[in-house]
């Protein structure tokens, strides 16, 4: 696709009204046009293009093709979109190609729209940047545990820091975000289990740690990652069922929900002494990675 003076990006999912992505991408757009102005020796007061980030609330994907056809016909081209719950896996059959990470995880959160130069038909390529986002979050936790930084330097981390890096992890949920979390934990050789609807459905590298269940004690120095949308605005009082009484100051907890900033899940963990973090840092880092992908295709 030729360089676009004006373009659009967006987010599909349900619900999406709470999303902070428009704010994040507005900063990316500003940086993009500042760079374009310097290249073209123009001031920002001159017209060098526009960019918008739209929220598309799609409860399901039955009308996805019709939605896409409508959007790509608009004057300002839709060059890509992000994908959030509940469509990170469901979107795959609608795509033409997957990046290696997206193919491995069978989960997509970033889609680039390319166009066949002959037919002008859209060609959709799915990527996964959640892996990068959670990787950065885990690096922050490890940095705290190794005392290479102070907790005040870590965005959205609350409670007294735990000075031992996670030795075990429990993933709550089994959606697209959970797949990215599991992948990163495996790359770091951190034994992990996936809990979904009150059952242990997946356990990895368990020779390094005794298998645990909802009815047994959670090991010390465990990391609990809440990947479901439970507790997300506007249902801020909702909380996933979890044996919080087993937590203490040796535990870490990350809730990938970022609105509200302190979820009901996080409050329960804090009350038990665990160190917690919300999903804002992961959101920012996965968005930066997604923007790099979009920017390469402008």
Please state what every model-predicted region is.
Residues 205-277, 281:
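Rossmann-like adenosine-cofactor binding region
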Residues 83-90, 177, 229-232, 259:
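Short glycine-rich anion-binding loops that position phosphate/pyrophosphate groups of nucleotides
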Residues 187-208:
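NAD(P)-binding Rossmann-fold cofactor-contacting core
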Residues 15, 198-199, 259:
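Residues in the short beta-alpha loop(s) of Rossmann-like NAD(P)-binding domains
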Residues 9, 168-169, 253:
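Conserved hydrophobic helix-helix packing surfaces used for dimerization/oligomerization
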Residues 13-15, 126-132, 138-142, 154-157, ...:
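Glycine-rich adenosine-cofactor-binding loop
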Residues 2-144:
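Phosphate/diphosphate ligand-binding glycine-rich loop within oxidoreductases
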Residues 136, 140, 275-298:
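Active-site capping/gating segments
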